[in-house]
A protein has these predicted regions:
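Conserved catalytic or regulatory cores that recognize and/or transform ribose-phosphate-containing ligands
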Residues: 1-168
Length: 168
């Protein structure tokens, strides 16, 4: 039986990947889950290996850096390029993806631009994806939803769709 490679795109502030992984294991689905670097501080600082100019910690949101704007901007760009190398490789290798937009609390603050960008990368690479988000995001995510294999509101629905893809 084929083992399906499934890329998990989504916010890194909750444990949704662990939940999905435990559900995949419980259902004994032939799926290997992959994801970007989910350690927020490590992901933000990975560019420091190129030029450790920012040894002080990154400020907490809302990210008003003042006179350090340029320093943190270029730190972010360097880190993003390294992170994108991993992300693009995993996207190219995946059979399909789960694209999750979280809900509530601080997740509304982050707006999850990275997730939208990764959905665009999946589309550009002709990779099918299942999108997961609450009903209140239907309108803002209509372009992303229009290219999805399925729209799910919870991970039980995701598992049902994955069963149909991977076991039939």
């Amino acid at each position: 039986m084929k083992t399906w490679n499934v890329y998990c795109s989504g916010e890194i502030h909750t444990n949704w990947r662990k939940l999905l992984s435990s559900m995949v294991k419980a259902e004994q689905l032939p799926i290997e889950l992959t994801s970007p670097n989910c350690n927020h501080k490590e992901s933000d600082a990975v560019g420091d290996i190129l030029d450790p100019i920012c040894e002080e910690p990154i400020p907490e949101p809302p990210f008003h850096y003042g006179e350090n704007d340029k320093k943190y901007f270029f730190r972010g760009v360097k880190s993003a390029k390294i992170n994108q190398t991993r992300i693009q490789s995993l996207i190219k290798e995946c059979d399909f993806a789960i694209v999750t937009f979280g809900i509530g609390g601080e997740l509304d603050f982050y707006r999850q631009w990275n997730v939208a960008f990764e959905a665009g990368c999946l589309y550009a690479n002709n990779k099918p994806y299942i999108v997961v988000h609450p009903e209140k995001l239907i309108h803002p995510l209509k372009e992303i939803d229009s290219h999805a294999l399925a729209w799910c509101q919870n991970y039980e629905q995701v598992i049902s769709v994955m069963k149909s893809i991977c076991l039939k």
